[in-house]
Design a protein with these regions (language model features):
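Beta/alpha (TIM)-barrel catalytic core signal, keyed to glycine-rich beta->alpha loops juxtaposed to Asp/Glu
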Residues: 109, 114-131
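Short acidic, Gly/Ser-rich segments with clustered Asp/Glu that frequently serve as metal-coordination loops
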Residues: 1-13
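Glycine-rich beta-to-alpha transition loops that act as phosphate-gripper elements at the mouths
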Residues: 94, 117-118, 173-178
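Generic enzyme active-site microenvironment
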Residues: 1, 15, 65, 194
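Short, glycine/acidic-enriched loop or turn micro-motifs at the edges of active sites
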Residues: 4-6, 20, 70, 178
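C-terminal active-site rim and adjoining tail of enzyme catalytic domains
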Residues: 44-49, 123-209
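Metal-dependent phosphodiesterase/phospholipase catalytic core, i.e.
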Residues: 16-115, 137-167
């Protein structure tokens, strides 16, 4: 899973935050600097902000879950995915339904997960046990990517996982960094875990066979 913003010259770059304060100690926004300027930033340990194109090229066999963090990120991410011929190995998503729809419109057939409003509608539909309503809220999607709790509800109860699966989507849970919680969620039947500790997750998956 990775987040994407657009540089000042319209290049998709891998960045979670809209500005560089946390990663580079600088107040500028990502969209105020060109891709070349961002590439010259020293993030320590000889690291820099990679572009989405560089990342897709560096890991040609990997599948990417891409969160479009800004309006400008939509067209730039679509361009990078299309240029890399990577439509079949990415999932594009956003908390914004408008951004999600825009990306899907430009990349027909690309996998996508529920935006914030679509997931909220599906979650509330599970409260009234409205199977048809859950399916309607998630129609055309491939996954829900969710925290363990939302709107004061347990989003990954066995009943809700069944309801989401019945609607034809996978259930991915974020952000899980402890192995006991990874094991618990996988035992409940979730399909994916978003984590900062891929090493720990791989140990859990290997142990489960």
């Amino acid at each position: 899973e990775t987040d994407v913003h657009a540089s000042a010259d319209g290049v998709a770059v891998i960045a979670h935050d809209p500005d560089l304060s946390r990663v580079a100690g600088r107040p500028q926004r990502v969209d105020q600097l060109t891709a070349a300027e961002l590439a010259r930033l020293d993030l320590g340990a000889e690291q820099h902000l990679p572009t989405l194109a560089e990342t897709l090229d560096a890991f040609p066999d990997a599948r990417f879950n891409i969160d479009l963090k800004s309006v400008g990120a939509v067209a730039s991410a679509v361009e990078a995915v299309r240029a890399a011929h990577a439509v079949d190995r990415v999932l594009l998503t956003s908390f914004s339904e408008r951004r999600r729809r825009a990306a899907v419109a430009q990349l027909p057939g690309v996998a996508t997960s529920a935006s914030g409003p679509r997931f909220a509608a599906a979650l509330l539909a599970t409260v009234v046990r409205g199977g048809p309503l859950v399916r309607a809220a998630l129609r055309g999607l491939h996954a829900v990517q969710i925290p363990v709790r939302a709107i004061s509800l347990d989003t990954v109860s066995p009943a809700r996982i069944r309801a989401f699966h019945a609607a034809g989507v996978e259930v991915h849970v974020w952000t899980i960094n402890e192995q006991p919680e990874m094991r618990r969620l996988l035992s409940l039947g979730v399909d994916g875990i978003v984590t900062d500790r891929a090493d720990l997750a791989m140990e859990v998956v290997a142990a489960l066979g």
